[in-house]
Amino acid sequence: MEGATNNWFSNKYSIGYALSGGFIKGFAHLGAMQALLEHDIKPNIISGVSAGALAGVFYADGNEPHKVLDYFAGHKFQDLTKLVIPKVGLFELSEFKDFLKSNLKAKKLEELQLPLIITATDLDHGRLAHFHKGDIAERVAASCCMPVLFAPVKIDETYYVDGGLLMNLPVSTIRRVCEKVVAINVSPLMAPKYKMNIVSVALRSYNFMFRSNSFPEREKADLLIEPYNLDGYSNRELEKAEEIFMQGYNATNDILERLQIEKGTIWNCLLYTSPSPRDTERS
């Protein structure tokens, strides 16, 4: 079974990124990653959930984080979703999957330049599914598929929804195979005010769940980055992608500069990088 967690790989990786869910705030992942790369903290493997899977797949496909913004420029939320008569979700993700297919060079996870593990929730069996091979667009869509808002995604006769329901910050996914894990959590806070409508109430309720299951994962990371000032963004404000990117970039630079002053030896250890196993195989 593809979602099984046993024996994915026997490789060891120097540094892994674990990227949380967070909907529109996922653009802060790209900013945080840009800052990390500029400090020479490069991942050999990425684990992503929902918005983190989306950010991770574009980087693993060979794109610099700041360049990914170009793919979304000029798009609105409604360009990537399709409003449907509510049956199992308000929107379906066919346009989103087409967008991924049009803008990614790789079509399958195993074709990416960097190993990427995408986490979704198996709706039929109530368990986590960790995808490391197969069609990219289907698996990213499955991981992003927040119940009620989006219709579940069917893969090989099984329905999947947002991985954040069970694990919104996927550190455990790669913890045992990485020397160091950098976790980026872009959904640590919630706005104090919210609208009383079906979408707003559903999203706020999910956020309580996401925060709760992220607490144990936060403790497992070697470096935790939680960009601030993200709680005021609406999940449909795609036009603010660059602004959200800069929030992640600036917050991460602040954290890294502080660590360089305070941590010394620990920081030098984290900065150690080595080629990924796929790089070694290609040489």
Language-model region placement:
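Single conserved hydrophobic/aromatic residue that forms the stacking wall/gate
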Residues: 272-283
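Patatin-like phospholipase
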Residues: 1-49, 57-274
